[in-house]
Structure formats: C-alpha cells, structure tokens
C-alpha cells in the first residue's frame, strides 16, 4: 500500500509543477467530475487546456494513480494486516521458500482468452447513460473506494497531500452513526419507547401500552426501576447491588401488565417522507450544521411536492418548443 501512496504523491507533485498557477482550476474541475456535474470528456478537455502538449501525460498518470489507489482498497481483504501474518499457534515455523525469477514470471503472465475482456453488447435504455450514479440515485452507501476518492479530491482542494486509511475508516463509522441517529429520531416519533438514564431509548413499539383510564398506570411506568444504584454489601462484593432481585422484577412486570390496555397498538404504515420531515423538525440536533439541515429540508419538501395538471401541460409545451428549435421530432 505504501508503494501506491508514494506513486500518488509523486504523480500529484509532477502534475502540480506542470500546472503552475492553474492548479486551483484543475482541482475545481476534478471536484466537479467526481460530483458528476461534468463528463469525463469535458474534464479531459479542460485539463488539456490548462496543460501544455508536453505535460498532458501528467494528467493521465495522476488519474491512473488515483484509480489504482481506490481499486487496491476495494480488492484488499478487510482483515489483511499484521494480525493475519502472525504464525498460527501449534505449527512449527519453517523456512520461507524463495521463488526464482522464472517462477515469478510464469505466475504473472498466463495465457488469456482475448475475447474474455471484450465488451458485451446488451440492449439498454438510452436514459440510463444520463443518470447520475450518486448515493441519492443508487439508494446505497458509497463503497470504500468511492469514499476515499472523494476524500482525496477534497484533501487536494484544501492543500493536503494525502488521505490515510484511518481517516477513511473514521468517516465510514461517522456516516453509519449519523444514519442511525436519523432512523432513531424518525422511529421515536412513530412508536412509544422507554428511556434509560434519561436519554437512552429502547423498547420501541412494545406490546404493553399503558391504560390511560387507570389512575396508577402512569405511576407504574414512571417508577420503573431499570438500573438501581450500587449498594454497599457486607461481603464487600461490588456487583451484589447492581441487579434487580427476581421477585422485584416479577412484581414490576405483573404491575405493568395489569396497568396496560387490552388492545395492542395498531400497525403503522411504512416510513414515508412526512415521518422524516417531522423527525427532523422535532430533533434538529441530529444535523448540527444549519447549511446541511436547510439543504436536506429543502430536498424533503421538494420530494413531497407534485406538479398539477396545468404545470404538466406547460412543461410539455416547453419541451416541444425546445425540440422544435433543435430540429427534433417528438414521438
């Protein structure tokens, strides 16, 4: 992995020297290409415009280094490292057999079928090529290689040289934690739940619901002993007072069942955009950044909006006028 990192840094340094004062414009175009706001052909045209004819190879070498770095992260196993290289217990450690140059050459160069890598012609929808392959369209989390490529572009834009694997792992964990917080805020608005220590939510949608017509129903839920404080015991064991006695737990369960209603809560429909909108409006602390919060709320409101019949007709007329100007015929 260190070899590919050094190759990427060397390619970046060579490209920066070739660009000179145009390096900021190149990073901006690279960011637009990663966001798929411009095509690969447009990005290559802008790169050739910023570079001289003798330095165009620096652009190709840099892109090849980035793609190689991201591809190595995807193809490498998750648990590869120093832990896997340790010798297994119970097996004698033998001498490592040194392979000859002939064996290495035969292993690397194997005869292949030239038609194996040929492109297969499959009938596709013409609109599929115009779709952006972003997370909002694929409905899936970005892969490790895609995320590192995006982080490398952002790091180069802010003057950093490289991105470590630990930083990519931290961003992936932070993304998963953020999505879990969003789901918790939405589910907590749909179904009842209990609190532990005043902040930890659990038991979402439990079958035992309180009976509002009983006077002691609310008190039974408020006085529920979940984690009693540690009590000093004469034996000196610290864990003797950290658990609830089975008789007390059975009495609490019987009281909750007696104070609960006869009917189970009705099943709810699947989570929709209205639930997400309500969850973010109530729990605004889930997205601390005001800019990100405002953009996401705008996207949610746009998803909830649908054009009426008149707007659809006006849009069709506008498309026909554009097609007439370009000399195209609509079917």
From Swiss-Prot:
Which domain of life does the protein's organism represent?
Eukaryota
Coiled-coil parts of chain: none
Q: Is Transcription regulation set as a keyword in this record? A: yes
Query: What is an example of a GO molecular function annotated in this UniProt entry?
Result: transcription coactivator activity
Q: Where do Basic residues bias regions lie?
A: 90-99
Residues covered by region (Disordered):
81-102
Q: What Pfam families does its record include?
A: SAGA-Tad1 (PF12767)
* A GO cellular component annotation in the UniProt record: nucleus
Task: Please tell me whether the keyword Transcription is annotated for this protein.
Answer: yes
| A GO BP entry | regulation of transcription by RNA polymerase II
Subcellular location field:
Nucleus
For this UniProt record, the keywords arranged alphabetically read as follows: Nucleus, Transcription, Transcription regulation
Task: Report the function annotation for this chain.
Answer: Probably involved in transcriptional regulation.
The record's comment on protein family reads: Belongs to the TADA1 family.
* Protein name in UniProt: Transcriptional adapter 1
Q: Which gene encodes it?
A: tada1
């Amino acid at each position: 992995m260190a070899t590919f990192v050094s190759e990427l840094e060397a390619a970046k340094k060579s490209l920066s020297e070739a660009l000179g004062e145009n390096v900021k414009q190149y990073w901006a175009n690279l960011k637009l290409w990663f966001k798929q706001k411009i095509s690969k052909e447009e990005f290559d045209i802008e790169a050739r415009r910023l570079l001289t004819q003798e330095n165009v190879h620096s652009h190709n070498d840099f892109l090849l280094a980035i793609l190689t770095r991201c591809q190595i992260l995807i193809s490498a196993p998750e648990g590869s490292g120093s832990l896997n290289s340790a010798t297994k217990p119970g097996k004698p450690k033998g001498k490592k057999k040194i392979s000859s140059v002939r064996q290495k050459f035969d292993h690397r160069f194997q005869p292949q079928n030239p038609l194996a890598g040929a492109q297969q012609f499959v009938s596709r929808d013409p609109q599929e090529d115009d779709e952006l392959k972003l997370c909002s369209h694929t409905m899936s989390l970005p892969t490790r290689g895609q995320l590192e490529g995006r982080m490398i572009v952002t790091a180069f834009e802010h003057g950093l040289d490289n991105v470590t694997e630990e930083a990519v792992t931290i961003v992936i964990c932070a993304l998963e934690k953020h999505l879990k917080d969003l789901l918790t805020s939405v589910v907590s608005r749909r179904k009842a739940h209990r609190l532990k220590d005043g902040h930890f939510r659990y038991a979402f949608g439990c079958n035992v619901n309180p009976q509002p017509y009983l006077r002691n129903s609310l008190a039974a839920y408020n006085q529920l002993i979940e984690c009693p404080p540690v009590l000093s015991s004469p034996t000196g064991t610290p864990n003797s007072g950290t658990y609830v006695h089975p008789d007390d737990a059975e009495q609490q369960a019987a009281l909750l069942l007696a104070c609960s209603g006869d009917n189970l809560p009705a099943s709810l429909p699947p989570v929709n955009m209205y639930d997400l909108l309500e969850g973010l409006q109530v729990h605004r602390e889930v997205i601390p950044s005001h800019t990100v919060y405002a953009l996401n709320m705008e996207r949610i409101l746009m998803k909830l909006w649908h054009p009426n019949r008149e707007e659809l007709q006006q849009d069709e007329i506008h498309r026909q006028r554009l097609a007439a100007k370009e000399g195209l015929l609509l079917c």
